[in-house]
């Protein structure tokens, strides 16, 4: 997500593709909630650490200690134990047992769920529409490529 879109690879016949390949041209936002844990915690922390865009929703769960399945018991089962901890430049050790706070906190209520609404998603859409209004992403028009004479 952090790779910058630099331009397009424009084939003679075919559809232009992003350059570098698979880069995005536009604004980003992360949507998260209290059920986001483990790699979801780390994704949200990384998204904030890199300054890729706002985070909308609720604070993440806060469970990033990694486990290792090192020992096998005589009955064939395996035990796991805490083994790895995550430290971020900006957040330090604070993600474990706390989580990542959103930039814009939105509480989803049981009533909205019953009504079939997702208040966090609705707020995220509002934020992105406003950002697009303030910082539009213009469409690209490709002129004919220049004619290059053969070298002499």
Whereabouts are the PLM-identified features?
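C-terminal "post-core" interaction segments
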Residues: 1-152
């Amino acid at each position: 997500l952090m790779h910058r879109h630099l331009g397009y690879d424009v084939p003679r016949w075919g559809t232009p593709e992003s350059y570098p390949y698979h880069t995005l041209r536009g604004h980003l936002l992360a949507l998260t909630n209290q059920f986001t844990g483990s790699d979801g915690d780390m994704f949200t922390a990384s998204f904030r650490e890199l300054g890729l865009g706002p985070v909308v929703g609720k604070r993440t769960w806060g469970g990033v200690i990694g486990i290792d399945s090192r020992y096998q018991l005589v009955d064939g089962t395996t035990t796991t134990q805490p083994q790895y901890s995550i430290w971020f430049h900006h957040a330090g050790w604070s993600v474990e047992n706390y989580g990542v706070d959103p930039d814009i906190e939105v509480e989803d209520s049981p009533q909205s769920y019953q009504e079939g609404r997702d208040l966090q998603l609705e707020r995220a859409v509002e934020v992105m529409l406003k950002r697009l209004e303030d910082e539009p992403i213009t469409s690209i028009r490709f002129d004919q490529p220049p004619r290059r004479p053969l070298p002499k």
